[in-house]
C-alpha cells in the first residue's frame, strides 16, 4: 500500500480593517467575496482597536504576519502619520484608508476613497469629462475626492461648505501641494453664492445620517443634474430625497463608493482588480432584507 501524497494548503495572506467601532463594517464580506471571485488565498478580518491604542494594535498585526490593512473612523489621520511613504491621493487627503507592508518592512499609505467614488460615478454616468461639479463639504471625505475628480477631467469643481473658510482653506492646501495645477478648474464658494445648474452634485457630509440637509439653493439642481450622496441606507438618503424633489435626473447613494474603494485597495494588494457588480448586488439585497 502506497502512501497518498500529502496535500498542503497554502497559507492565507492576512488582511484586516481597523476601526472603533468596527462591528458594522462590511469590509470582511466585501473582501471575502473579492477573494473568492479572483481565487486569491487571503483572509480578512475586522479588528477593534482601542481609541488610544491604534498604533500598538496595527504594529502587532503586521508583526504577526499581516500583509495589508484598511483603516476607518477614527484612525485615518493616525494611519497617515505612521506611513513611511504615501500616494499623491493620501498626501492631499491628509488621511489613509489603505496600508501596505512593503518588502523592505516600511509602511505605504494610500487613500482609495476618491478612486472608489470616481469608479462608481463612471459606472453610473459613463464619463465626468467637462462636467460642472459641486462638492458639498470640506472634511476628510471631501479632501480624498478632489484629486481623483480632477484627474477624471471634470470641467469645473466647486467646493462649498457651511463654514466657507474651510472650503477656501481646502482649495488653498490643494493648490500648494499641486503647485497650481488644476487651479483654473477648482474654486470655493459659499452656499448662498452658488448659482446656475450643476451637472453633478456630490454630498460628502454626513448630514443625511441625522436626516438633515445642507442649506443649498434649489437653483443648483436642473432636470439633467445627477446627485450623489456618500451616505447610504435601505431607503433613499435625506439628501437624495431632497434632490428628487428639486427635479434631479438621477440620484445615487454611496454603497457603490464603499465597494469601489475596497476594490481599489484589493487591487493595490493583490495586483488584480475584482468585478464589483456581484458584491454590490449582495450588499444592496442585504440592506433591503435587514430593513424589513
UniProtKB/Swiss-Prot annotation:
Reactions catalysed: shikimate + NADP(+) = 3-dehydroshikimate + NADPH + H(+)
Listed EC numbers: 1.1.1.25
Subunit structure: Homodimer.
Protein name: Shikimate dehydrogenase (NADP(+))
Pathway recorded for this protein: Metabolic intermediate biosynthesis; chorismate biosynthesis; chorismate from D-erythrose 4-phosphate and phosphoenolpyruvate: step 4/7
A single BP term in Gene Ontology: chorismate biosynthetic process
Residues that bind shikimate: 25-27, 72, 97, 113, 232
Protein residues bound to NADP(+): 137-141, 161-166, 230, 254
NCBIfam families: aroE, PRK00258.1-2
Gene Ontology CC terms: cytosol
Amino acid at each position: 500500500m502506497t502512501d497518498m501524497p500529502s496535500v498542503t494548503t497554502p497559507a492565507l495572506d492576512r488582511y484586516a480593517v481597523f476601526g472603533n467601532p468596527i462591528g458594522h463594517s462590511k469590509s470582511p464580506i466585501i473582501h471575502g467575496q473579492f477573494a473568492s471571485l479572483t481565487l486569491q488565498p487571503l483572509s480578512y478580518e475586522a479588528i477593534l482597536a482601542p481609541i488610544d491604542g491604534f498604533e500598538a494594535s496595527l504594529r502587532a498585526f503586521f508583526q504577526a504576519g499581516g500583509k495589508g490593512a484598511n483603516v476607518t473612523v477614527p484612525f485615518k489621520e493616525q494611519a497617515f502619520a505612521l506611513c513611511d511613504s504615501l500616494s499623491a491621493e493620501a498626501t492631499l487627503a491628509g488621511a489613509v484608508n489603505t496600508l501596505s507592508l512593503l518588502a523592505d518592512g516600511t509602511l505605504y499609505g494610500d487613500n482609495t476613497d476618491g478612486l472608489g467614488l470616481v469608479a462608481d460615478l463612471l459606472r453610473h454616468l459613463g464619463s465626468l469629462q467637462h462636467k460642472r461639479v459641486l462638492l458639498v463639504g470640506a472634511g476628510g471625505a471631501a479632501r480624498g475626492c478632489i484629486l481623483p475628480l480632477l484627474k477624471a477631467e471634470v470641467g469645473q469643481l466647486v467646493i462649498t461648505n457651511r463654514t466657507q473658510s474651510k472650503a477656501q482653506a481646502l482649495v488653498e492646501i490643494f493648490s500648494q501641494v499641486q503647485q497650481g495645477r488644476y487651479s483654473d478648474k477648482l474654486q470655493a464658494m459659499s452656499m448662498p453664492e452658488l448659482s446656475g445648474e450643476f451637472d453633478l452634485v456630490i454630498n460628502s457630509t454626513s448630514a443625511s445620517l441625522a436626516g438633515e440637509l445642507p442649506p443649498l439653493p434649489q437653483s443648483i439642481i436642473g432636470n439633467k443634474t445627477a446627485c450623489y450622496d456618500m451616505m447610504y441606507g435601505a431607503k433613499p438618503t435625506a439628501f437624495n430625497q431632497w434632490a428628487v424633489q428639486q427635479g434631479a435626473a438621477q440620484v445615487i447613494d454611496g454603497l457603490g463608493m464603499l465597494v469601489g474603494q475596497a476594490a481599489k485597495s484589493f487591487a493595490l494588494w493583490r495586483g488584480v482588480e475584482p468585478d464589483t457588480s456581484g458584491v454590490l448586488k449582495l450588499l444592496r439585497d442585504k440592506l433591503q432584507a435587514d430593513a424589513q
